[in-house]
Curated annotation (Swiss-Prot):
HAMAP family the record matches: Arg_succ_synth_type1
Species for this entry: Acetivibrio thermocellus (strain ATCC 27405 / DSM 1237 / JCM 9322 / NBRC 103400 / NCIMB 10682 / NRRL B-4536 / VPI 7372)
Catalytic reactions of this protein: L-citrulline + L-aspartate + ATP = 2-(N(omega)-L-arginino)succinate + AMP + diphosphate + H(+)
Record EC number: 6.3.4.5
Protein's recorded name: Argininosuccinate synthase
Keywords from the UniProt entry: Amino-acid biosynthesis, Arginine biosynthesis, ATP-binding, Cytoplasm, Ligase, Nucleotide-binding
GO BP terms, alphabetized: argininosuccinate metabolic process; L-arginine biosynthetic process; urea cycle
Gene for this chain: argG
Length: 405
C-alpha cells in the first residue's frame, strides 16, 4: 500500500479549519498535518493538540513565533514607518507571511505535497498566504477550500461538522470577526459594515479603554531606541515581545491606538474595520519624533515616500520580494543614527511629544536660537533666496512679457 501524500494546514481550531481537516481527507485522500502558530493572540494553544487529532489530523505542530514576529516583521516595518492608507499599522498583514513561512518549512521537513489555508476568497489573507508559498516553495500545491467547496455559509459549516461528529463551539452570529496578535486586535462585521455607524467601543474594545474613560491625569512614557529598534521603556530594558506587551498595557490604560478605517482591500472592494493597536501606536509616534531629531531633511522626506510603498508591499502580501528587501536595506542605513530617548505624554487617546534627546541629534540650538548668536549670518539669506527663487522670477517675467497676447 502506497503512502498517502501529505498536506500542511494552517490551523486555528475554529469552525473553518476544523472542518477543512475532514474535507481534505475526503476530497484529496491526503494525510493532514495541522500547524497552529502562536503570534501573541493570547490564547492557550495546547488544547488544539487533542482537538486536531480528534478531527482527523495525523499530527499537529504548535509553533511559538512571537519573537520572530517582532524582530523580523514588526520592527522592520516600524523602522520603515510604514502605514497603509495613512491609518492602518498592518497588524494582520505582516503576521500572515510569517505563518505561511513556517507552514512551508514544515511542509519541506515532512515531504508534503501541498499546503492549505482557511482564508476566504473575498479577503486579503488568501493572497498573503499564497504569495509567500510561491516565493519560498513554488513547487508546493496550494489548496484554498473556500474557493472550491460547496459550503457557502456558517450554517452549512455547522451542518457539515455535525454530520461528521466534529466538536465545534456553536454560537450565534453575534460577535465581531476578530483577529488578534501581539501587535493588534481587529474587529469587522455586524454594525461596523455600515460606515455611518459609530463603533460601540464599550462593546468592542478588548485591549484598551475608550479615551473618555481613560485617567484624568496624563501618563508619561520614555522609550529608548537603538538604531531604530526600541530597547527600553521608562529606563527598563525589555526583550522584543515583552516590550510590546508593556506598551500595550500602558497604551490600553490611556485609550491609545483606536483606528477606525474604511480601507481598500487588494481584491478590489472596500472594507470597514476597527483596530486596537495601543503599543504599536506609541512606538510609531516615538520613532517618528526621534527621526525628526536625527535624520537630515532629504533622507527624512525621501524615506516618507518609500514608507508608503513599503506599506503597500506588506498589505499586498509581497513581503518576500526583492523590492521589499531592497527598501528594508535602505531603511537600515537610515536608522544608523536613530538612537536616543523620546518622552511622550499620553492623555485620553492622545499622544503628545514631551521631549527627545540623542547623541546623533542634528538640532543645533546655536543655529536655531531666536536670541543673539554669532554663528548664523542673516545676510547670507538674501543670496540664497535670490537663487532659490530665480525660476519663479523668470516665470513671472515671461508671463508679464506675454500679457495680452
Amino acid at each position: 500500500m502506497s503512502q498517502k501524500e501529505k498536506v500542511i494546514l494552517a490551523y486555528s481550531g475554529g469552525l473553518d479549519t476544523s472542518i477543512i481537516i475532514p474535507w481534505l481527507k475526503e476530497n484529496y485522500d491526503y494525510e493532514v498535518i495541522a500547524m497552529a502558530a502562536d503570534v501573541g493572540q493570547g490564547e492557550e494553544l495546547e488544547p488544539l493538540r487533542e482537538k486536531a487529532i480528534k478531527t482527523g489530523a495525523s499530527k499537529i505542530y504548535i509553533e511559538d513565533l512571537k519573537e520572530e514576529f517582532v524582530t523580523d516583521f514588526i520592527f522592520p516595518t516600524l523602522k520603515a514607518g510604514a502605514v497603509y492608507e495613512g491609518k492602518y499599522l498592518l497588524g494582520t498583514s505582516f503576521a500572515r507571511p510569517l505563518i505561511a513561512k513556517r507552514m512551508v518549512e514544515i511542509a519541506l521537513k515532512e515531504g508534503a505535497t501541498a499546503v492549505a489555508h482557511g482564508a476566504t476568497g473575498k479577503g486579503n489573507d488568501q493572497v498573503r498566504f499564497e504569495l509567500t508559498v510561491k516565493a519560498l516553495a513554488p513547487h508546493l500545491k496550494i489548496i484554498a477550500p473556500w474557493r472550491i467547496w460547496d459550503i457557502k455559509s456558517r450554517e452549512d459549516e455547522i451542518e457539515y461538522a455535525q454530520a461528521r461528529n466534529i466538536p465545534i463551539p456553536v454560537s450565534k452570529e453575534d460577535n465581531y470577526s476578530m483577529d488578534r496578535n501581539l501587535w493588534h486586535l481587529s474587529h469587522e462585521g455586524l454594525d461596523l459594515e455600515d460606515p455611518w455607524n459609530e463603533p460601540q467601543y464599550d462593546k468592542i474594545l478588548k485591549l484598551m479603554v475608550p479615551p473618555e474613560k481613560a485617567p484624568d491625569k496624563p501618563t508619561y512614557v520614555e522609550i529608548y531606541f537603538e538604531k531604530g529598534i526600541p530597547k527600553k521603556v521608562n529606563g527598563v530594558e525589555y526583550g522584543p515581545v515583552e516590550l510590546i506587551e508593556v506598551l500595550n498595557k500602558i497604551g490600553g490604560e490611556n485609550g491609545i491606538g483606536i483606528v477606525d478605517i474604511v480601507e481598500n482591500r487588494l481584491v478590489g472592494m472596500k472594507s470597514r474595520g476597527v483596530y486596537e493597536t495601543p503599543g504599536g501606536t506609541i512606538l510609531y509616534a516615538a520613532h517618528r519624533e526621534l527621526e525628526l531629531l536625527c535624520l537630515d531633511r532629504d533622507t527624512l522626506h525621501y524615506k516618507d515616500l518609500v514608507a508608503q510603498r513599503f506599506a503597500e508591499l506588506v498589505y499586498y502580501g509581497q513581503w518576500y520580494t526583492p523590492l521589499r528587501e531592497a527598501i528594508s536595506a535602505f531603511v537600515d542605513v537610515t536608522q544608523e543614527t536613530v538612537t536616543g530617548t523620546v518622552r511622550l505624554k499620553l492623555y485620553k487617546g492622545n499622544i503628545i511629544s514631551a521631549g527627545a534627546k540623542s547623541d546623533y541629534s542634528l538640532y543645533s540650538e546655536e543655529l536655531s536660537t531666536f536670541g543673539e548668536d554669532n554663528v548664523y549670518n542673516q545676510k547670507d539669506a538674501e543670496g540664497f533666496i535670490n537663487l532659490f527663487g530665480l525660476p519663479m522670477k523668470v516665470q513671472a517675467l515671461m508671463k508679464e512679457k506675454n500679457k495680452g497676447k
